[in-house]
Design a protein with these regions (language model features):
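Cyclophilin-like peptidyl-prolyl cis-trans isomerases
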Residues: 1-143
Length: 143
């Protein structure tokens, strides 16, 4: 999601590029960080208490599959409760439940979830950037 990543040199640190504007946070109960969720990156709460999203940077949620006990323990630590949609998603396809309603989710990978794991498994440099560029093509499908 960093616009500076296009044609970036090998080893160049990325993750700080983008426009000077942010987008208001938008949380919807049905849009959660299940595996494959497309979500907007943002600055930390300390400098961004309204949780406004980056104007261009995004990420794809990977996470893990949780047991019900793990979800219950996580919910207790967070002081929250997970709804049935979250429980179903995180105990089957997995994801990143602690990011729900903290970062705006705006889309979902609908085919090729296994590619997320392949991308996450490649060799990375000290900036956590793949040592070989991985080009993505994104197609918007409206429902």
């Amino acid at each position: 999601g960093d616009p500076d990543s296009k044609n970036a040199k090998k080893g160049q640190m990325l993750g700080q590029g983008g426009p000077d504007y942010t987008i208001a946070a938008e949380f919807k109960q049905e849009l959660i960080h299940r595996k494959g969720a497309l979500a907007a990156a943002r600055m930390a709460d300390q400098v961004n208490p309204r949780k406004e999203s980056s104007g261009s940077q995004f990420y794809i949620a990977q996470g893990k599959v949780y047991t019900k006990d793990e979800l219950n323990n996580l919910a207790a630590r967070m002081g929250k409760q997970f709804n049935q949609t979250q429980i179903e998603a995180y105990t089957t396809v997995g994801g990143v439940p602690f990011l729900d309603y903290e970062y705006t989710v705006f889309g979902q990978v609908i085919e090729g979830l296994e590619v997320i794991d392949k991308i996450a498994a490649v060799q990375k440099d000290h900036y956590d950037r793949p040592t070989e560029d991985i080009k993505m093509t994104i197609k918007v499908v409206e429902q």
